[in-house]
Amino acid sequence: MSEKDELMAEAFAHLEAGDPETALEIGKRLESLQYSGAYEVQAMAYADMDDTEQAVAVLEAGVAHAPGVWLLWQLLGNYRSDLGRFDAAIEAYEAAGNCAPDEDLVIVDFNHANALARQGDLALAQARLDRTLESPHLAQAGRAFIENAIALRMHLFVAQGEPKAAIATYEALAKQEHDEEGSNVSMADVLAELSLAYKQSGDNAKALATALDAVQSYKWSDAALWALRAARDEQSETARAMHLIVEGQWYEPLEDEDPDGPAPEFVTTYDVVAEDEAEALRLIAECEPPQVRESLRIAETHLIDNEDASATAYKGVYATGDYHMYQPGEEDESLDD
């Protein structure tokens, strides 16, 4: 493995470990070696540090330096889309499509379709997504990618008032035979779109049950949390927005730490709109594994000062933090609010 390849692998390992600062330093070393991957690493590091503007600036420099590297164009499109610059994002995807290998066009087309959907060009998004789903290279992109593409197709059907088509799309996915496991992350988004389709078709019971399944699949999915709030469709002028620190007992030992030891305790955070702490805890419990629900307790509650939003928002969970595990008697890690 060359020095550049080793540095790239090291940088991605730091990104995966939640250390974008070190990854950024490595990216700058790669830039001094005149390697185009430097721009990819630096941009991803800036994005992980919530500086998407700087990520875009780095990538714009990158595509000027290496205009034939499709990965840089695609990443530039993704970050421009995140900033709401959809026309510029689409230009980047078109440039990526002009230099990407045939087997990678399926990914470019998917991201292109997603930007069009975000922009509200639903018909164009559907046409671009059709290119993804009809590609001969779709299977090699992996099951999780296919699930993401199906979630987007279902989203487009729901957005155009076609819930039956969305439900049929899910049923076709469920019937597909496949050797590879998908992803609980992508499946949460699929189930979220299915819940919204049931809601739109008037089947409130299925909408709620499916939204609960989506949250159990991956509770950090914004789509799943939204589907659950939409399925309940509850608003109250007296509900309050709250940031809560929640503690509980995990249900099994941590295999990577002490597989034969006791199950750890945990602390996490939730942003919830509810009448009071008791209702907030009930809503939180639905997002947690059934085995831990009885152990849940609220350690701290901080009211979010946004009266206007609380009065009009749907009740439910809006965000949840990571788990911080610790053994009883140990000092738990501090949480970032």
Locations of regions flagged by a protein language model:
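Start-of-helix register in tetratricopeptide repeats
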Residues: 5, 37-40, 70-71, 105-107, ...
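Alpha-helical segment of the N-proximal tetratricopeptide repeat
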Residues: 2-50, 78-81
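Short coil turns that delineate tetratricopeptide repeat
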Residues: 33-35, 67, 101-103, 137, ...
